[in-house]
């Protein structure tokens, strides 16, 4: 549902208000912004301005989220994470990763959105990398994350795995959220029926 009233006329983005946000919340919200950006980059409806904002978002989050996770009072990290989250909000051309997570969340009310995205991230992007379906965009994202001379989508996935490890999220499992293989079989139909998206 997108209506004008969903979008604020003015937003106050103040890093000082974020200093006491707990580490887990910091990582989940930060990675939600990261995936909004990464999905904008690989989206088939790509836009040059969206890509510019998204790649900068990815660069900032890769650099500053681990710092904010380890030291929530680090003002520089909070400042640049606030910038990254703001940039990610300008263009949210989501792909099926967000669609799948929304369906996961509809079955599990306690599943934090960012955590759900992290759970599916490696397999999701590996699906594209194995098929070389988004090589150029994924190479761009790897560069944004600081990878030197990336040559394939796999380089982005390795950088993503390293980022998740650095923020204590490498071991999040769907099974720990109560998600079963049988339940997952229901997801494709649910995605089409409720959200109208592909997978």
Predicted regions and their residues:
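Active-site segments that bind and position negatively charged phosphate/pyrophosphate groups
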Residues: 40-154, 158-159
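C-terminal charged capping/lid subdomain of soluble metabolic enzymes
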Residues: 140-199
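Glycine- and other small-residue-rich loops at beta-strand/loop junctions that grip anionic moieties
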Residues: 23, 50, 176
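Short runs of predominantly hydrophobic/aromatic residues within well-ordered alpha helices
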Residues: 27-30, 78, 117, 184
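A glycine/threonine-rich phosphate-anchoring loop and its flanking beta-alpha core
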Residues: 1-46
């Amino acid at each position: 549902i997108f209506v004008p009233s969903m979008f604020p006329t003015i937003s106050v983005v103040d890093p000082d208000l974020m200093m006491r946000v707990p580490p887990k919340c910091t990582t989940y919200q930060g990675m939600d912004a990261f995936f909004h950006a990464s999905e904008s980059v690989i989206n088939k409806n790509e836009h040059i301005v969206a890509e510019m904002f998204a790649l900068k978002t990815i660069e900032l989050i890769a650099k500053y989220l681990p710092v904010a996770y380890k030291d929530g009072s680090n003002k520089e990290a909070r400042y640049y994470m606030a910038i990254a989250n703001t940039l990610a909000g300008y263009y949210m051309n989501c792909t099926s990763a967000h669609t799948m997570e929304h369906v996961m969340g509809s079955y599990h009310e306690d599943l934090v959105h960012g955590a759900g995205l992290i759970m599916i991230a490696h397999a999701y992007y590996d699906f594209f990398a194995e098929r070389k379906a988004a090589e150029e965009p994924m190479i761009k994202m790897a560069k944004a994350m600081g990878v030197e001379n990336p040559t394939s989508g796999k380089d982005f996935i390795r950088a993503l795995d390293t980022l998740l490890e650095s923020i204590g999220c490498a071991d999040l499992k769907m099974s720990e959220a109560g998600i079963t293989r049988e339940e997952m079989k229901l997801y494709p139909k649910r995605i089409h029926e409720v959200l109208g998206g592909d997978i």
